[in-house]
Amino acid sequence: MPYFTIDTNKPQDSISSAFLKKAPNVVPKALGKPESYVSIHVNGGQPMVFGGSEDPCPVCVLKSIGCVGPKVNNSHAEKLYKLLADELKIPKNRCYIESVDIEASSMAFNGSTFG
């Protein structure tokens, strides 16, 4: 159930369909999860400042039941920062990505929790 949310000050209409097609491939490959469970949410046009500047920036949260943690977060970050830089043209030094391990009993899908 990986969930990757991106809040950004880039206008919503500047989020390309190429990004929306590529992101659901990058996230599950990074985590080793099936694409059928991946959710990507992009919130464009947010009033945001990063480092005192209104230049394009996102704040991202990656949530997953397992597959995140100290031993793997650097690998995930590398892939996600590359996605953001390549597709949204956002420099790596203008973004935070938070990785959150969700308890299976705290996430529901199709009428029941995962655990």
UniProtKB/Swiss-Prot annotation:
Keywords associated with the record: Cytokine, Isomerase, Secreted
Catalytic activity field: L-dopachrome = 5,6-dihydroxyindole-2-carboxylate; 3-phenylpyruvate = enol-phenylpyruvate
EC numbers: 5.3.2.1, 5.3.3.12
Name assigned to this protein: Macrophage migration inhibitory factor homolog
Pfam family, one: MIF
Disulfide bonds: none
Active site as annotated: P2
Chief localization: secreted
Any Gene Ontology CC annotation: extracellular space
Keyword Isomerase appears in the UniProt entry: yes
Coiled-coil regions listed in the entry: none
Xref: InterPro entries: Macrophage_inhib_fac, Macrophage_inhib_fac_CS, Tautomerase/MIF_sf
Molecular-function annotations in GO: cytokine activity; dopachrome isomerase activity; phenylpyruvate tautomerase activity
Subcellular locations according to the entry: Secreted
Residues that coordinate or bind substrate: K33, I65
Function in brief: Tautomerization of the methyl ester of L-dopachrome. Inhibits migration of human peripheral blood mononuclear cells.
Organism: Wuchereria bancrofti
Family affiliation: Belongs to the MIF family.
